[in-house]
Amino acid sequence: MYIVMELQKNKDGHVANIVTEHETLAQAESKYHAVLSAAAVSGIPIHSAIVVSEEGFPVEHRCWKHEEAAV
């Protein structure tokens, strides 16, 4: 089991923490990359996503501000 945790700040300044569970690492990575793509398209100012294994170890993590990512 793998978990994808998202932390995103919307345009109103509210922070949402979204957690989804996935059976395989491939499914989790697919969701992870979809989250990052959606954040880039929507212009969410701060976004973080992480894939965590069943044992609690981070597999993949990325956090950025769009102003920095656009450079």
Q: Where are each of the predicted segments found?
A:
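Short aromatic-glycine-(Arg/Gly/Cys) micro-motifs in beta-strand/loop hairpins
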Residues: 1-18, 44-46
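Short, mixed-charge low-complexity intrinsically disordered segments
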Residues: 37-71
